[in-house]
């Protein structure tokens, strides 16, 4: 009887200790790195938060404010702190994070990354080629592409140049180094241009107000590559709903935090594309018609 009581007390003690450990255990920490202030970033972060809401996790959101020096400072801070998982948003931020942090799992969101030989890295790709959109608007014969010097966009710039050459489209291009260059760049676009084109180019989309005002003056559309740009005034874009990118990345992060190795979670492509339309901006241009948009093979979302 005495021994039985001892065992009872011992197991009761173990049970209390286990419960106390579970209750007092520190939550996992996830660092989300956003490249700049933009509606699309807020939506992606919101999706990440939604996907992780039912597990004990602390989400730290760090904003690089489109500054490479701030980005490096954030990455170095994360590298030296008790962070369990990192979610960088965008190709440039993801590449920089991967090159500096080699001992923590990384889930890249809205990025094009070659995951070969990167066992701690996985992610979500949401890219759609701008040529896929332009090809469905064959009446556009004179277009202007505004882009930054970011290495990420150069392949798509070259792809658009080749597409324009092969399809007898007059393509005017203007590369800018910073937002101070943008007003002159858009003013210098040919008078006969039928549309401004922008990519998923963080510097350019942060200056969308400059672009849309010039587009309104010319009565031409501003064709973008993401939902957030349309919310902020671009006429149309074909892309994915930004929040869903975050949800997909968050679900990957959840699996990793629950014990699945990143190398066992393949990179995924977002395939459910949507045509985003800003109705106010649409009414301020004379090139695209409702009929043009109605034949595009995507579900529509209007703002």
Swiss-Prot record:
Annotated SUPFAM superfamilies: Periplasmic binding protein-like I (SSF53822)
InterPro entries according to UniProt: ABC_transpt-TYRBP-like, Peripla_BP_I
Domain of life: Bacteria
The protein, known as: Uncharacterized protein RP367
């Amino acid at each position: 009887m005495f021994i039985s009581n001892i065992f009872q007390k011992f197991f009761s003690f173990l049970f209390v200790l286990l419960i106390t450990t579970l209750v007092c255990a520190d939550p996992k920490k996830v660092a989300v790195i956003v490249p700049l202030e933009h509606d699309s970033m807020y939506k992606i972060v919101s999706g990440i938060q939604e996907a992780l809401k039912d597990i004990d996790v602390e989400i730290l959101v760090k904003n690089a404010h489109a500054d490479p020096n701030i980005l490096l400072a954030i990455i170095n801070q994360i590298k030296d702190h008790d962070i369990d998982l990192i979610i960088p948003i965008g190709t440039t931020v993801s590449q920089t994070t991967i090159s500096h942090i080699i001992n923590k799992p990384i889930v890249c969101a809205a990025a094009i990354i070659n995951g070969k030989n990167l066992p701690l890295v996985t992610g979500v790709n949401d890219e759609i080629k701008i040529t896929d959109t332009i090809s469905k608007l064959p009446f556009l014969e004179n277009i202007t592409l505004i882009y930054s010097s970011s290495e990420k966009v150069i392949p798509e710039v070259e792809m658009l140049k080749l597409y324009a050459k092969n399809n007898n489209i007059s393509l005017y291009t203007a590369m800018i180094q910073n937002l101070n260059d943008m007003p002159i760049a858009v003013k210098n676009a040919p008078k006969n241009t039928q549309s401004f084109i922008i990519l998923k180019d963080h510097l350019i989309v942060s200056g969308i107000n400059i672009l849309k005002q010039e587009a309104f003056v010319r009565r031409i559309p501003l064709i973008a590559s993401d939902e957030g740009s349309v919310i902020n005034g671009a006429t149309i874009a074909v892309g994915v709903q930004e929040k869903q990118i975050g949800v997909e990345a968050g679900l990957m992060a959840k699996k990793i935090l629950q014990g699945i190795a990143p190398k066992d979670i393949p990179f995924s492509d977002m395939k459910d594309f949507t045509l985003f339309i800003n109705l106010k901006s649409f009414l301020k241009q004379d090139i695209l018609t409702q009929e043009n948009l109605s034949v595009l093979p995507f579900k529509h979302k209007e703002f």
